Amino acid sequence: MFIDNVSAIEVMDSRGNPTVKTTVELSDGTKESAIVPSGASTGKREALELRDGGSRYMGKGVLKAVENVNAQISDALIGLSPFNQAVIDATMKELDGTDNYGNLGANAVLGVSMAVARAAAKSLGIPLYRYLGGANAMVIPTPMLNIINGGSHADNSVDFQEYMIMPVGFEDFATSLQASAEVYHNLKAILKSKKHNTALGDEGGFAPDLSSNEEPIQIIMQAIEKAGYKAGEQMAIALDVAASELVSDGGYRLDSENRTVTSAELVDYYVDLCNKYPIVSIEDGLSEDDWDGWKLLTEKLGDRVQLVGDDLFVTNATILNEGIKKGIANSILIKPNQIGSVSETMQTVRLAQRNGYKCVMSHRSGESEDAFIADFAVALNCGEIKTGSTARGERTAKYNRLLEIENEVVYGEYLGSELFN
């Protein structure tokens, strides 16, 4: 069995920007495709997303990345076995010749990497999660649902990028998703009753103008109660601050509250919020460059709150290893397009898990109908997944795939409240 053809075309993502769709065909006729996502708030150490520049699509075209797939990558992979993912990914890494896919583009390489894995699984007649994870792939991830959007994901006054609910008090994924959808709809009703805008942000959450960064939490608490659930027992709250986007004049600018704070003041603010509300997770609470601030945050909250590094670690095993040595954070967000290939993503997850760091599989704000990360989360036993609210098809595609997987995995395990015990 060998790879017979590799190709790519330019398609659209959920924000109306171009992205790369790759297709891999095997010698037995098996054909599979993948669509690459794209982020809005990105860490500066992420692998390079190759864009065309110029006036076409306001500089965001991806025809260069498409051509790299159709020419260089295709030539390098045709004839290779699809069943050795590490060799496939290493071949593309060597072909690129840089640390961050600065020549071929991570959007070209990742698309091919994903499509190869899909084609190999299909050829063997097994699900993708089983192909990548083997017999040990059995944990159905607990969702982190972004129901109020702010920051760079919305055109509103809220500084923090994501306000999420986590259905931790349920026994299976399907019931958790049901409860989350009910909270989401009750949240909409509350926002309407308060005359707030119920327009949606990039990830399907609501994007109202609110008076502070605490008010969204208060409204979510009301929505949980109105839906008939108990905050802290059945529904917990998670935040993605995306603090790198708030850096200003040596501090952090909170426009909605008309103040600039130091790292220590921001950490104290988080401590206060965690004392008042059932917050179990804070992502990117400090800037990717503020390692002293991260150290302080970890000392203050690391024993009781999940502290997730996204821009901080960018799914990079080398950077994560430095964080582990310095005792920074206790969890990592996993975004395959930050590092550029399936194999490198798996390497980072294994490093995190060996060192007691939790792993949260994640979408990007620019998504598609591709649900690869749903299978990937199960394959790697991540335990948690971020893929938006229960609205917008590119978000629900992942949830619907997880519902299918839960029905397939006979010995599947949904951790729920055990995540934070």
Swiss-Prot record:
Reaction(s) catalysed (UniProt annotation): (2R)-2-phosphoglycerate = phosphoenolpyruvate + H2O
PANTHER family: ENOLASE
SMART domains per record: Enolase_C (SM01192), Enolase_N (SM01193)
Cofactor note: Binds a second Mg(2+) ion via substrate during catalysis.
Entry-linked Pfam families: Enolase_C, Enolase_N
Ligand binding (Mg(2+)): 240, 283, 310
Keyword match Cell inner membrane: no
NCBIfam families per the UniProt record, alphabetical: eno
InterPro entries linked to this entry: Enolase, Enolase-like_C_sf, Enolase-like_N, Enolase_C, Enolase_CS, Enolase_N
Annotated function: Catalyzes the reversible conversion of 2-phosphoglycerate (2-PG) into phosphoenolpyruvate (PEP). It is essential for the degradation of carbohydrates via glycolysis.
Record-annotated active site: 203, 335
Protein name: Enolase
Annotated TM spans: none
Single GO biological process annotation from the record: glycolytic process
UniProt organism field: Sulfurimonas denitrificans (strain ATCC 33889 / DSM 1251) (Thiomicrospira denitrificans (strain ATCC 33889 / DSM 1251))
